[in-house]
Structure formats: structure tokens, C-alpha cells
Amino acid sequence: MPTRQSTSWVFTLNFEGEIPILPFNESVQYACWQHERVGHDHLQGFIQFKSRNTTLRQAKYIFNGLNPHLEIARDVEKAQLYAMKEDSRVAGPWEYGLFIKRGSHKRKLMERFEEDGEEMKIADPSLYRRCLSRKMAEEQRCSSEWNYDLRPWQEEVMHLLEEEPDYRTIIWVYGPAGNEGKSTFARHLSLKDGWGYLPGGKTQDMMHLVTAEPKNNWVFDIPRVSSEYVNYGVIEQVKNRVMVNTKYEPCVMRDDNHPVHVIVFANVLPDLGKLSEDRIKLIRC
């Protein structure tokens, strides 16, 4: 299976007792982290490596035997801010090295939006809506907190997400009764950097959203009213890493070297006539 590589990673390190000392070395360009408490004590942090090809194994190695959960940081500036947010902070933040910003056209568009959103709304309503959507998502991400004890099924999901994704496994969270915390957990999970949220829908609409962020992990939160119409085709496209967008300007996106996590939250069991049983990791609420 291809190995994930990146310059920038975000990490969460759970601990008990004394705050762990992080032994960063010359392979690290920059790091920031802080002590947070949301149900339990943990360090939340962000690391930039000097090498653009730092693997997950190499990133874990610098923690000298500690066992953090690491994910690739898609937006370095947002990741840095999230690692130093005031909400849930107990101590810190602490920094190591020199942070390197990335110039981006996206940031320039957001600067235009912030400076004169009303003008953008008139001149380009579509661009305005996209910028507004991104801003609202960032605000939610920065203010997101999980102030509940994890239920056993939620802990099981988190353990699965600590493993490397593959091209087949689909995590299916099944809870027929309702009020088990599926949607709340799905929304919280989708606010993590590198994750997207889909409530179901038509293939064209869903794939248009997926191909806008093709490297994301994806949460499919299926409403009870749509349980009979789960879009298995989209789920398989995302897992198989060959994604077809036929809306507006048809295109095919291939991402063969980058498997992602896919989680379905539903009130129904998977239809084994539409997904092979060996693909499903079933978790019951």
C-alpha cells in the first residue's frame, strides 16, 4: 500500500499525569502544541518537517516512543491556528523552530472577501458563496469542542482512524433506534482538518463536492428519511480513488496513491447486494 507523505502533520497525543516532553530535532522545521482537556488530557499540535516526503512512520519516530495520532495537514495556517486555539487550552502554547507560510491564490480570494464581501456578492455571487462557506467552516472548526465522554462505539471508530486507510475498508456505523450520537459525532469528526461531510444526495451533486476536495477523508451521514437511497456508487468511487464528476465540466480524477477513510453513519445495515461483505467494518451503536 502506498505510504502517505507530507511536509506538514497535525497530531493529538493523549496522556495521564505529567505533560510529556516532545523531543523535536533538526528534522523539524517548526512545531507548535499545547495542553488541552476535553474529557481527557492531551497535547494538540502541528509539525512542519524540513523534508517534503516525511512519512507517517518517520513523523511518529521523532516522538521517541510516544504514540500520537497523526494526520496530514491540508492547510498549514489553519492547522497552526487550531493547534494554538484558546478553547479547551490548559497550558501553552509552545513553539519550536520557524514557521514557513505558503502563498496561495485561495488566501488572496479570502482577503478580497474579508475586505469587501458585499462587492464580491454583487460581482460574483457564486464566488461569494464559496468564500462564505469556507469562512463559516473555518469558524466552526476553530470553535468545535467535544465536551462528552466517548461512548464505546465512538472509541472503536477513533481507534480505526488511527490506522492507515486502505482501498477497501468502509467503516459503517449502524444505529437503528436514533439518539445514539451518530450525527453529533459525524459533524464533529468532519470538522477535523482533511475531512469532508456529505448527507447523501444525487451522484452528480455529491461527486461535484468530492472532487473539489479529492484528498479528503469523508463522512457520509445518512438521514433516516434517505435510508432507502444510500448512494453506494459514490461511496465506492471515493474508496476506489477513481472519481468521476459529470456536473458542469465532466472530468475524471484519479488518486491511486492516496487511500482515504470513509465512514457511513446510518439507521440501516449496509446492503450486501451493493457492497461486498468483506469491505464493511460494521460498528453497532
Swiss-Prot record:
Residues 3-99 form the CRESS-DNA virus Rep endonuclease domain. ATP binds at residues 175-183. It is found in: Host nucleus. A divalent metal cation binds at residues 36, 42, 87. GO terms for biological process: DNA replication. Divalent metal cations, possibly Mg(2+) or Mn(2+). Initiates and terminates the replication only of its own subviral DNA molecule. The closed circular ssDNA genome is first converted to a superhelical dsDNA. Rep binds a specific hairpin at the genome origin of replication. Introduces an endonucleolytic nick within the intergenic region of the genome, thereby initiating the rolling circle replication (RCR). Following cleavage, binds covalently to the 5'-phosphate of DNA as a tyrosyl ester. The cleavage gives rise to a free 3'-OH that serves as a primer for the cellular DNA polymerase. Homooligomer (Potential). Rep binds to repeated DNA motifs (iterons). This is Para-Rep C6. It comes from Subterranean clover stunt C6 alphasatellite (SCSC6A). The gene is C6.
